[in-house]
Amino acid sequence: MPRLTRRFHARDPVTLARALLGQVLVRVLDDGERLAGRIVETEAYLGVIDRAAHTYGGRRTPRTESMWGPAGHAYIYFLYGMHHCVNVVAQGPGEPTAVLIRALEPLEGLERMRAHRAGRRPKARLRDTDLCSGPAKLAQALALDRRLDGTDLVEGEHLFIERGRRVPAGNIVTGPRIGIAYAGDWALRPLRFHMHGNPHVS
């Protein structure tokens, strides 16, 4: 399948968050195995004006540098000292906005995903719907961490997004983002999007 282009990513984060639904996130492991999942849930982060964004107020740190760069790159951060989350940089240089990928519908490499998720509990048997139903879960399932932060999702070898299927506007559910109560009124804005009726959402 063809990959998404730079132009696809270079738009405002709300438009991109909706457009990413139905597209396919691909992770190629060091041994060549392909893991892939359809994007079924996203959240938009609007940069310097958004109290929930890591770049709110123009904050620029080594951790957030990827958000300030070109569209179509990965911004991967470590949360609570336990979990990684993967974002797609939107717009372009100097416009630090991004889309958080919240959930995937696993398509390829499910057994490898299951092994990654089981970790030290190799006998645990996770259902397909539990493999990638949350940002931390999908990062663990696909073996994503800070080493892949800044990866070019258009031209990269180990992490990229392929064109999937367009989700009609009528099949997209909109609501508030999750886990950002600290952001005041911004916590209530309808910036979370997911595919209606999909069992893999978080």
Question: At which residue positions do the language-model features occur?
Answer:
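Conserved, well-structured core segments that form or line functional sites
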Residues: 1-202
